[in-house]
């Protein structure tokens, strides 16, 4: 398995309690923990708590206040609401000291083929090799972002739609790790 980014290597500190490290350097220079990092750490802590192989089907989080990189690691408390053979649901609370940062609900399901396949058609846009490289990888180091509508991400026709391609160069054996990577990057795109 490829090396996970340090921020996704949550460490168990006691039963149901995890510690999520912050980056060594503040990527944006604002001393504010990025929301995608907290979502990704919630996924990793929740996944580490389930006893059988499950994948995240959904995560919903409310952010109460900003965390600070200078305040130390994000502390994650995972409470199991239900844990069955096929489904599990967890409440994950992210704090720094006595400060509530976020509370999330994570729904997990056994890894199985999706029998319901419906989605809108992919847009007819140029592929990543014909798109301009973007600078949106600042919050998520190592990510490659390609902006279909040009270097600034604004659509040529002035419409509110922007298209981009996102790729992280590593792939992980863990479904949760791959989901965490996308969850980490998505709020910043």
Label every PLM stretch briefly.
Residues 1-189:
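Terminal targeting signals and extreme-terminal segments of soluble enzymes
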């Amino acid at each position: 398995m490829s090396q996970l980014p340090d921020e996704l290597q949550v460490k168990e500190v006691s039963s149901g309690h995890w510690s999520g490290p912050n980056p060594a350097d503040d990527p944006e220079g604002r001393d504010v923990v990025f929301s995608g990092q907290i979502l990704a750490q919630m996924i990793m802590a929740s996944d580490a708590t389930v006893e059988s192989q499950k994948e995240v089907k959904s995560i919903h989080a409310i952010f109460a206040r900003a965390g600070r990189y200078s305040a130390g690691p994000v502390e994650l408390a995972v409470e199991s609401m239900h844990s069955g053979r096929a489904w599990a649901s967890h409440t994950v609370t992210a704090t720094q000291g006595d400060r509530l940062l976020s509370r999330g609900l994570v729904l997990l399901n056994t890894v199985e083929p999706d029998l319901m396949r419906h989605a809108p058609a992919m847009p007819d846009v140029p592929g990543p090799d014909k798109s301009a490289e973007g600078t949106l990888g600042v919050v998520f180091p190592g990510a490659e972002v390609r902006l279909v509508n040009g270097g600034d991400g604004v659509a040529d026709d002035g419409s509110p739609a922007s298209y981009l391609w996102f790729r992280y160069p590593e792939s992980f054996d863990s479904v949760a790790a791959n989901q965490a990577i996308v969850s980490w990057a998505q709020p910043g795109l």
